[in-house]
């Protein structure tokens, strides 16, 4: 079973449409009313149905009740702030930690200028951008896992 159907260029009907400027030159069907009126609402309602169904079948459990007289040993931020928290926790100088965090967006802004000679849109044909992306993803995952561990095991992830 094929996901994409390749056009049969030997078909006389398709060749007649292509000669008139119709057909696959314009990527098939128009967005109005086909996509905007029929397909998008079905996708939106399907997404809402999945979210409601999953929340009914498996509701999220609430944590323990808050106790103002018993503070935890280590207070952790929300999960999406773990890598940033780990940088601030490990770097000895807090000003250096903040400077490291400002270097990330600056480095991301430099990528288009570094790789301006490459005109390809395919990420596999853009080695610098792909290497920076993979390195950043691996570093973020490493820092996120390390932030969830105690400080003495956070750099080695408890492996050594």
From Swiss-Prot:
<keyword id="KW-0813">Transport</keyword>
<keyword id="KW-0472">Membrane</keyword>
<keyword id="KW-0793">Thylakoid</keyword>
<keyword id="KW-0812">Transmembrane</keyword>
<dbReference type="InterPro" id="IPR005870">
    <property type="entry name" value="Cyt_b6/f_cplx_suIV"/>
</dbReference>
<dbReference type="InterPro" id="IPR036150">
    <property type="entry name" value="Cyt_b/b6_C_sf"/>
</dbReference>
<feature type="transmembrane region" description="Helical">
    <location>
        <begin position="36"/>
        <end position="56"/>
    </location>
</feature>
<dbReference type="GO" id="GO:0008121">
    <property type="term" value="F:ubiquinol-cytochrome-c reductase activity"/>
</dbReference>
<dbReference type="InterPro" id="IPR048260">
    <property type="entry name" value="Cytochrome_b_C_euk/bac"/>
</dbReference>
<protein>
    <recommendedName>
        <fullName>Cytochrome b6-f complex subunit 4</fullName>
    </recommendedName>
</protein>
<keyword id="KW-0602">Photosynthesis</keyword>
<dbReference type="Pfam" id="PF00032">
    <property type="entry name" value="Cytochrom_B_C"/>
</dbReference>
<comment type="subunit">
    <text>The 4 large subunits of the cytochrome b6-f complex are cytochrome b6, subunit IV (17 kDa polypeptide, PetD), cytochrome f and the Rieske protein, while the 4 small subunits are PetG, PetL, PetM and PetN. The complex functions as a dimer.</text>
</comment>
<dbReference type="GO" id="GO:0045156">
    <property type="term" value="F:electron transporter, transferring electrons within the cyclic electron transport pathway of photosynthesis activity"/>
</dbReference>
<dbReference type="GO" id="GO:0045158">
    <property type="term" value="F:electron transporter, transferring electrons within cytochrome b6/f complex of photosystem II activity"/>
</dbReference>
<feature type="transmembrane region" description="Helical">
    <location>
        <begin position="95"/>
        <end position="115"/>
    </location>
</feature>
<dbReference type="InterPro" id="IPR005798">
    <property type="entry name" value="Cyt_b/b6_C"/>
</dbReference>
<feature type="transmembrane region" description="Helical">
    <location>
        <begin position="128"/>
        <end position="148"/>
    </location>
</feature>
<comment type="similarity">
    <text>Belongs to the cytochrome b family. PetD subfamily.</text>
</comment>
<keyword id="KW-0249">Electron transport</keyword>
<dbReference type="GO" id="GO:0031676">
    <property type="term" value="C:plasma membrane-derived thylakoid membrane"/>
</dbReference>
<dbReference type="GO" id="GO:0009767">
    <property type="term" value="P:photosynthetic electron transport chain"/>
</dbReference>
<keyword id="KW-1133">Transmembrane helix</keyword>
<comment type="function">
    <text>Component of the cytochrome b6-f complex, which mediates electron transfer between photosystem II (PSII) and photosystem I (PSI), cyclic electron flow around PSI, and state transitions.</text>
</comment>
């Amino acid at each position: 079973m094929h996901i994409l159907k390749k056009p049969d260029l030997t078909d006389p009907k398709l060749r007649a449409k292509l000669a008139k400027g119709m057909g696959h030159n314009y990527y098939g069907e128009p967005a109005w009313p086909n996509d905007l009126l029929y397909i998008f609402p079905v996708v939106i309602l399907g997404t809402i149905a999945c979210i409601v169904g999953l929340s009914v079948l498996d509701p999220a459990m609430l944590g323990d009740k808050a106790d103002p007289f018993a503070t935890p040993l280590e207070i952790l931020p929300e999960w999406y702030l773990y890598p940033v928290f780990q940088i601030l926790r490990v770097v000895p100088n807090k000003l250096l930690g903040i400077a490291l965090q400002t270097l990330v967006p600056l480095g991301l802004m430099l990528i288009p200028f570094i790789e301006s000679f490459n005109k390809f849109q395919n990420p596999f044909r853009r080695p610098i951008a792909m290497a920076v992306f993979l390195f950043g993803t691996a570093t973020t995952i490493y820092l996120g896992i390390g932030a969830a561990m105690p400080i003495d095991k956070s750099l080695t992830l408890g492996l050594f």
